[in-house]
């Protein structure tokens, strides 16, 4: 892949993740744990890990986290989000690469969501300066399983329909990415 094409893909991934991040702020989720979110932008992160690899996914997470914090005016949450996002991305990429066949897409996503919550909790422990915040861990683990399951299912649905959409765009003159077809066949 050329440098320009890679940069274009990253820009598209960041834009998609930002749209999902901003959209999520408008979705009322009354049953969620305080501080927990669905993590819709992580659908893109998971797809980038599969389609482009861990390093591109880390770039997407860093840019999406910074721009999302900037656009939402919540710069104080940047430290929480970046640590959680980077930890989740690394865990998902490593688990997918080494144990993807064992865990599947949903399992990888659940482990990523749990890692994200643990990363944020570590930052909270440093910021607050007390071990008391770690009492929140069991609640965040349950929330991580639920949100990770949702994100994994959503990413799986995207992967199911992505090859068809790419094939149609190739027929219309757009270049086709064979890696997407390979991943879709692995599912």
Residue ranges and their predicted role:
Residues 74, 78-79, 98-187:
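Membrane-embedded alpha-helical hairpins and interfacial helices in multi-pass inner-membrane proteins
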Residues 38-54, 91-96:
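Generic transmembrane alpha-helix motif of multi-pass integral membrane proteins
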Residues 17-21, 68, 88, 92, ...:
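Alpha-helical transmembrane segments of multipass membrane proteins
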Residues 21-38, 63-93, 105, 127-132, ...:
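Interfacial aromatic-anchored transmembrane helix boundaries in multi-pass membrane proteins
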Residues 7-12, 43, 47, 55-62, ...:
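Hydrophobic alpha-helical transmembrane segments
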Residues 1-48:
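Hydrophobic transmembrane alpha-helices
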């Amino acid at each position: 892949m050329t440098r320009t094409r890679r940069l274009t893909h990253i820009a598209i991934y960041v834009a998609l993740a930002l749209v999902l991040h901003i959209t999520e702020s408008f979705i009322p989720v009354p049953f969620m744990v305080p501080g927990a979110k669905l993590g819709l932008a992580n659908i893109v992160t998971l797809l980038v890990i599969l389609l482009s690899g861990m390093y591109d996914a880390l770039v997407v997470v860093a840019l999406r986290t910074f721009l999302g914090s900037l656009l939402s005016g919540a710069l104080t949450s940047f430290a929480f989000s970046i640590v959680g996002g980077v930890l989740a991305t690394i865990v998902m990429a490593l688990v997918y690469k080494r144990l993807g066949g064992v865990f599947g897409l949903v399992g990888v996503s659940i482990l990523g969501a749990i890692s994200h919550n643990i990363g944020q909790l570590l930052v909270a422990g440093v910021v607050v300066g007390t071990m008391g915040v770690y009492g929140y861990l069991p609640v965040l683990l349950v929330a991580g399983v639920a949100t990770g399951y949702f994100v994994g299912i959503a990413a799986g649905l995207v992967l199911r329909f992505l090859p068809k959409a790419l094939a149609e765009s190739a027929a219309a003159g757009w270049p086709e990415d064979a890696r997407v077809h390979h991943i879709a066949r692995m599912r």
